[in-house]
Amino acid sequence: MKEKRERVVQFLKANYKGEFVVSETPNDNGKYEVSSNGKLTLISNIEHLTSEDFVFTQVDYFNCCDSILLQTLEGAPEKARVFDCSGCISLQTLKGAPQEVEELYCISCHSLQTLKDAPQKANEFYCSYCTSLETLEGVPGMVEKFECSGCDSLKTLKGAPQKARIFNCSDCKSLQTLEYAPLEVDEFYCFDCNSLKSLENAPQQARVFDCCGCIALRTLEGSPKKVEKFICIYCTSLQSLEGAPQEANKFNCSYCPSLRTLEGAPQKTEKFDCSGCESLQTLKGGPGEAKWFYCSGCTSLQSLEGAPEEVEVFDCNNCQSLKSLNGAPKEAIIFDCSNCSSLESLIGVPKKVEKFYCTGWESPKYLESAPQKMEEFDCRKAYGKKNL
């Protein structure tokens, strides 16, 4: 009996790293029970997680990453808080994974073809950067946080967990439609998607929606209408904001090299950001009631016409094309036009501004019409200034 237990101990020491406890006597099936309150990591390439002499019962964090021979999860712990089988190139099914796991990771798996037999009680599930998975069928239906970002093979969201609170399918190179996306999700991320052409079937109840960095998305039609925070920065294909959610509290379409007009921008958003835009020539159609407005770093903006008039914070610093402040918001409390290389005059500056920044100017010669009641005024490094 002692020899059998010693074989179990030696097997674990040879193939696993971490602390573990082996029962003193075998169970009714004649096998020793092994548990761990810490992290137990598989460190050798073996075809089976256990030997015929023992079983895993409960492990806090079980890690069998990067195994190149493991074809089955049979013998995995019955219960685990975290279960990680990422990087496996031989595993084709999740059968045998602990059913009561809280967090499950199978990231960068190149052999997993189905999520059937996945543990249905997982709170968090990650199958990111999978090159073999074509469908989400089998995903735990009640999972709260689900991530399948960077998937090279996923063609449909069929089987996606409909009750997920956070859903991330970003950096997907094969997904063309959001059909079957979880409808009641709170936060939805599909940024850096190289294949998504339409937001049709996007979840309409999302509080946060992020589709930034999309190189295929041409329209915002189908975007969630009641979203609070909407992000589509670095989108290289978006030409119009038509279809944008009109009730978003925060809207960010900065660094878009293709957007030429703000027509369709949500009018009642509180915080609007179109900074770094390389194609925007006018603010016409911009949100008229925004409290914070950022158009800094614009290389194409020539006029502030259309800027929200009652904005509190206005930022157009590092603007390389703006020549005049005519049309600038009149009620701004904070106004920043520092490092503007093209601005020639301060005519049009808001008169009630409290904090005004025009540091780093190289072109202005006069500060005519400068604000008179400000608390802070900074025009350091204004090399071309000759007259105050």
Model-assigned labels for residue ranges:
Residues N387-L388:
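Ankyrin-repeat-protein effector appendages
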Residues K2-E24, L42-E47, C358, C379, ...:
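Catalytic phosphate/metal-binding cores of nucleic-acid and nucleotide-processing enzymes, i.e., regions
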Residues N15-C88, V101, A290:
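LRR N-terminal entry segment and analogous cap-like coil->beta motifs
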Residues L69-E368, Q372:
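Thr-biased low-complexity repeat/linker tracts and other Thr-enriched repetitive architectures
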